[in-house]
Amino acid sequence: MTGKGQGFGFGLGKMKELAEAFKKAQQVQEGAKRLQEELEQMEIQGEAGGGLVKVIVSGNQEPKRVEISPDALAQGADLLSDLVTAAMKDAYIKSTATMRERMEDLTSGLELPGF
């Protein structure tokens, strides 16, 4: 037999915890939307060959532009291809690291009560 007010384990205290959890989830959702907009506007640069080739992507890894110096063009197609690929990888790594850091900032300290 359960005591008064205990019911199915969803007493007033649990309802407050649940309401707080929903409030925090809503805050995270709003923060995630703002973060998504911010990431879209970012320009993160990857480079190769000491700056001969630069690739600029958004915080969401969306390519924005590629800059190739005349010196890189003079190196020939094979080397240019390698430089572009290396710059793309560099930009991708920097962009994903930025996204991960921003997501950690958004969710740090998130304590869902009762879970």
UniProtKB/Swiss-Prot annotation:
Indicate whether Protease appears among the record's keywords.
no
Compartmental location:
Cytoplasm, Nucleoid
- Which superkingdom does the taxonomy of this entry point to? Bacteria
Query: Which terms are listed as keywords in the entry?
Result: Cytoplasm, DNA-binding
Q: Which GO terms describe its molecular function?
A: DNA binding
Q: Which SUPFAM superfamilies does this chain map to?
A: YbaB-like
Q: Name one GO cellular component term.
A: bacterial nucleoid
> Is DNA-binding included in the keywords of this UniProt record?
yes
The entry assigns this protein to a family as follows: Belongs to the YbaB/EbfC family.
Its biological purpose: Binds to DNA and alters its conformation. May be involved in regulation of gene expression, nucleoid organization and DNA protection.
Could you tell me which HAMAP family the record lists for this protein?
DNA_YbaB_EbfC (MF_00274)
Q: How does it assemble?
A: Homodimer.
Q: What is this protein called?
A: Nucleoid-associated protein alr5067
Q: Which organism is it from?
A: Nostoc sp. (strain PCC 7120 / SAG 25.82 / UTEX 2576)
Lineage, uppermost ranks: Bacteria, Bacillati, Cyanobacteriota, Cyanophyceae, Nostocales
